[in-house]
Amino acid sequence: VVTQYISFYRDLYQIDIRNEIDWNEKQVLLRCYFPVDVHTDEATYEIQYGNVKRPTHYNTSWDDARFEVCAHKWIDLSEDGYGLSVLNDCKYGCDIHNGRVGLTMLKSAIFPNPDADKEHHSFTWSLCPHVGRWQENDTVAKAYALNNPYQATRKTNEGGTLPKSYSLVSVDVPNVIIETVKKAEDGEGTIIRMYECWNRRSK
């Protein structure tokens, strides 16, 4: 059973599709395709701490056999002046070919575990059309927001005061992402892991 909840927003160029699936299939691959009117010969796929461009067409039999590739939180297909970013919160097999974007939602292999993934699944992807390039339209930030949504919590006042806004650490350029902040294991310092996400020089 597949149930989808589609959300449109008045002031946000984003369509969220939440999927609720009760999966009991055997040797079935479930994919979703989005037809797109974007003309380009390459697409951009997020990888760990960066992104990579891959062709949107097949040149060799090896390309033809590779029906999908991996990506992390987002993929983007853009032509000059317009594009579409597709965000996801846990599905990493995808492809962009012949004017359509495909995502693998579920598969039910029989080896090594014949009952793998036979359960309830809940996941979301988002369609984000944009003018210009993905770098100028917060694709990376939107993907992080989908994967790490804000969570409100109640806290009793313990006598201190807080400013209206506060951040432990911040950057002043949009193409540098603070990925991890942790306490050092061999001292009193703090370890901050960050990376540049646009393939651009930065200071």
How should these model regions be labeled?
Residues V1-K203:
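C-terminal (or distal) subdomains of carbohydrate-active enzymes
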